[in-house]
Amino acid sequence: RDSNVSANTITLHGGLVRNNFFMRLNGENCENQTLGLYLADRSQHVDNYVHMDHAYPNSRSNQLFKGVLDDISTGAFNGRILVRQDAQKTEAYQSNNNILLTNDAKMNSKPQLEIYADDVSCSHGGTSGQLNEDAMFYLRSRGLPHKEAQLLLMYAFAHEVIGEIKIEPLKDRIHELVEKRLRGELSRCNYCEMHCGEPGKN
């Protein structure tokens, strides 16, 4: 009752990654925010599963998951919001947005609502697409090289998640790691045996 919980997951590397979140708002006037950012390339796969259970009235939840997929990487988002019959006055929102940098990158998004109360405000949605061509053209027309323009748009896309992190030193560190990852400067897992799609290796 009267509790507030925030959960964040930032996935920068990993051959096969599964992030599971099981949340139950088990009292009145509870609030939860669950955020996710995932960056994948080569043959990496990132799977996010979120189950949000609203069991009592006057609770609020927000899910925001965003991903950037490159090369032949794949991603999945399966998010479920359950609003029980007694959970009147619930507010629950869920969004999954993705940028696919190649035609071979794939994303499966499945946002779900299961509502048994009639006095609620809930929404869900998902998008997958390429970088905005108009924004790219604008940045290029201002003299930015293609790679820098692409990087700027990807960073702005990711910032919506990073900007919600409440702990400032952690937020700054995540900003730094994400920028390095997008620039290709963050080293991969040197001791991983999966090789994540290196030529000639599976």
Features from the language model and the residues they span:
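Conserved beta-strand/loop scaffold segments within soluble protein domains that form the structured core
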Residues: 1-137, 141-144, 158, 162-202
